[in-house]
Amino acid sequence: RVDDAVLWLLDDNASATRELKKQIAYHGVPLDRVVFAKRTSHPEYRARMQLADVFLDTTPYNSGSTARDVLDCGLPMVTLSGRTFVSRMAGSLLHSIGLDELITDNHADYENLVVDLAADRARLASYRHHLIQGHKLREAAPAKLVRSLETQLKQMVQAL
């Protein structure tokens, strides 16, 4: 549904990559529309995220720590939340930063949202801006949490 879309996948299992390529060809998708990227250093892995437009979270097992990396790099992510903890991790992260509109609860809405985002560069840019600004705030959050905890502990000790 998105003519110029390219899917970017991790290539770290030769047999899985072979099977994926077979399935891609079987479904009539040109192989040049799929990029298989090898594992790389963490800095390069994070730099690659600047080249993507949107991250498609997996289901039923969400991205977990990868989702955190994606959001910290300013890459918008679409997720499909389910009923289990592992299917709600990415949704929880998106909710915590005020991006509930990127959380879907069925396959049709997930696909439609991805297609809509692919056609709306301004909306994607707005999400990137929100994520980058929010990252600056999240960087300060641990120190604020520690100060709050210190205050609470001091008050508890003084109350003894």
Model-based region annotation:
Residues R1-D4, L10-Q23, V35, T40, ...:
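C-terminal amphipathic helix plus adjacent low-complexity
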Residues D4-W8, V35, D53-V54, P76-M77, ...:
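Beta-sheet entry/capping signal
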Residues D12, R39-S41, Y61, G82-R83:
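An acidic- and aromatic-residue-enriched active-site/binding cleft used to recognize and process polar
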Residues Q23-V29:
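Short helix-loop-beta junction
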Residues L31, T58-E139:
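Catalytic binding pocket for nucleotide-activated donors in carbohydrate/polymer assembly enzymes
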Residues S41-A52, D72:
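Short acidic alpha-helix that forms the nucleotide-activated donor recognition element
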Residues Q50-P60:
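Acidic donor-binding loop of glycosyltransferase active sites
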